[in-house]
């Protein structure tokens, strides 16, 4: 059992869109928990205050049973294990997922995807429904900036998760001097298409200086270029993230272009998806829309 079993740094009821999940139970709330530390060494970490810290000598303890009780009391429809890398709390997560499944709550991970196939199989068997995987860059960038990490293991997680029925969305924090070059972005977009499918959403999100990295914030034109690259690669759904109100934060039908989901920040202003289809042309819209 891990030493941080049940050690909690943060608890919050969040819109599922904040994870971000845009094609998984939109408009619902996920009761979200984080612990401490990380298995990556990214110098730009946006959650560095918990991911780069060891747990206190006496951390707050939340049992899986209490977490499920808090989830239901918050009015949330599901759980999310996030904020820091959830696989560091594997045993606790497995206990939470099993309890949540019995209570008809959905289960999500926000993860860097660096886990063994055996760990992912345990998670899916326990009730993991969805993962947002942080794809930090191409192989060169990830190895250089994330302390020797092999990005192929992250792609393997995406493929295995998809094959086991897990809903997958992928996020790339677009960072100047790290992964903002056209070649890097195109390689990610093309790998999404080839490895997990063109219908998997890709979130290209704005970076802001944090922790030990002082590159300037992501220019808007870079994010919009990333969006175009994703579409050119054949992705059906590409989103510009961390820019509330941007037109590319909305969902459009890949068949006819109809605006299907209009977002205002993390709120859903309109959702026209019906039975997983566009009401205008009948084209399927990949996702979990229950």
Stretch-by-stretch model annotation:
Residues 51-52, 86-88, 113-119, 129-148, ...:
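Conserved radical SAM core fold
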Residues 70-71, 100, 123, 161, ...:
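Generic structural signal for hydrophobic
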Residues 78-80, 106-108, 130-132, 167-169, ...:
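Structural preference for beta-strand elements that scaffold enzyme active sites
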């Amino acid at each position: 059992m891990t030493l941080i079993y049940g050690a909690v740094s943060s608890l919050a009821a969040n819109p599922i869109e904040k994870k971000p999940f845009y094609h998984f139970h939109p408009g619902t709330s996920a009761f979200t928990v984080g612990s401490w530390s990380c298995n990556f060494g990214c110098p730009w970490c946006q959650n560095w205050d918990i991911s780069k810290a060891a747990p206190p000598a006496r951390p707050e303890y939340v049992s899986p049973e209490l977490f499920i009780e808090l989830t239901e009391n918050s009015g949330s429809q599901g759980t999310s294990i996030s904020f820091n890398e959830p696989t560091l709390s594997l045993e606790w997560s497995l206990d939470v997922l099993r309890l949540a499944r019995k209570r008809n709550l959905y289960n999500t991970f926000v993860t860097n995807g660096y886990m063994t196939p055996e760990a992912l199989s345990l998670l899916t068997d326990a009730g993991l429904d969805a993962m947002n995987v942080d794809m930090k860059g191409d192989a060169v960038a990830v190895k250089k900036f994330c302390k020797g990490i092999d990005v192929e293991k992250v792609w393997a997680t995406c493929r295995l998760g998809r094959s086991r029925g897990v809903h997958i969305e992928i996020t790339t924090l677009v960072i100047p001097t790290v992964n903002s070059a056209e070649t890097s972005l195109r390689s990610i977009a093309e790998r999404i298409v080839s490895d997990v499918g063109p219908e998997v959403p890709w979130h290209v999100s704005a970076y802001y200086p944090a922790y030990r990295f002082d590159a300037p914030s992501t220019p808007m034109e870079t994010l919009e270029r990333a969006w175009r690259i994703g579409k050119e690669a054949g992705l059906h759904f590409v989103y510009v993230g961390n820019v509330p109100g941007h037109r590319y934060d909305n969902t459009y039908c890949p068949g006819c272009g109809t605006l299907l989901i209009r977002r205002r920040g993390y709120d859903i202003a309109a959702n026209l998806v019906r039975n997983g289809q566009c009401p205008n042309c009948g084209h399927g819209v990949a996702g979990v829309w229950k």
